[in-house]
């Protein structure tokens, strides 16, 4: 499907087209419509489905992000059942895993398989862009309820990855992994339990933040990665020959990375801001995405080389009560760095699926980490343990350690509201949030931008530490200067094609807001 540039008025471009300049990483994004005929099924839990009807015509679309050349391609395709919980198609797992997928040479395909994402007002594809998507039909022109055609639509999309050369631009798929997040993972679990055996398309599957029970006689390996939100149900199914369940302590169903990763294109395509409306500071900072990455890597090794992934410890319960430490963080489960080397209370409590993130006070941080080197060393050791255990990849561990080295933990600096990692823009502008937003957009040479914000963070913290000392004004002036340099450099990156227009606009707006607030502290 030919496309105009994302953000153009006619909306002749893919819905939620990526806000990454993929060409900088030798990747491309393409969208295809595809059509066929689908069955509906009688589905009973734990049994093979029976065909109810056959031959219903459909027309859907798939969004493909892939290496531009065979040399960049690792031969593995992740096919994501797009999530429609918010009333529109969302590429949730791509958002979490894009850095890993691009780094390691995966292809990714997102499939529209449900009528909410295709037809429901106000943001279904057909409503959002009638000229581009008006012919799509995944519910038999409204006559087939319950997304009953979706299973065959998803299966046939997976088959097309292998059988239709145009889908991958001539690249050869050697392994195809099914993937779904939350609601989509529930649909995928039903497909795996009852339908996939009829015409096996997928070689492995990743189900995230949905604890649906799977049949133990499945013929493909499956890993379920769960957060604290699904903790009770995660204990209902033990690991088996082809199934693993990894529950991540402190992680939440939808956390900060998920929110920041969609901020630019959400504003571009729907004029919506990715914000929270929670009384208690929300959005866990536990990096569940690193466990997702390890799960995909493990599935590939499991399928290709029969190397079984590790069994993960369960979260610790007393009856139905999740046990917590003195910081109110969960005990047991996959121990993320954020749980092993905590700087905050992170949990699934509070605000629906967003959970909680409440930073420790300065006294607690100073007691836990007397020096910056102490903090970084503990992060490094935790990352090494996770890599050895199989729940984190070495490249992600290196990134986590680098982030620790960039931080100011252990330096006995006061990080006030203008630099604190709490809540979100625009309700809580802060330099650390700006640095995270910048990093999450995968800007080519984006470390240059992040470094400028880090300098601003340090200057703000030094100013906060000085308190009413007149020298604090100089520190805030330094911070404002670093942020102005950031804006200038972002504009240069936009002109040079390193950052997408919508991403640059978001970052410049956030930085400008922060500059105004920081400059007020120089008066």
Predicted regions, residues:
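Soluble extracellular-acting proteins and domains
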Residues: 351-523
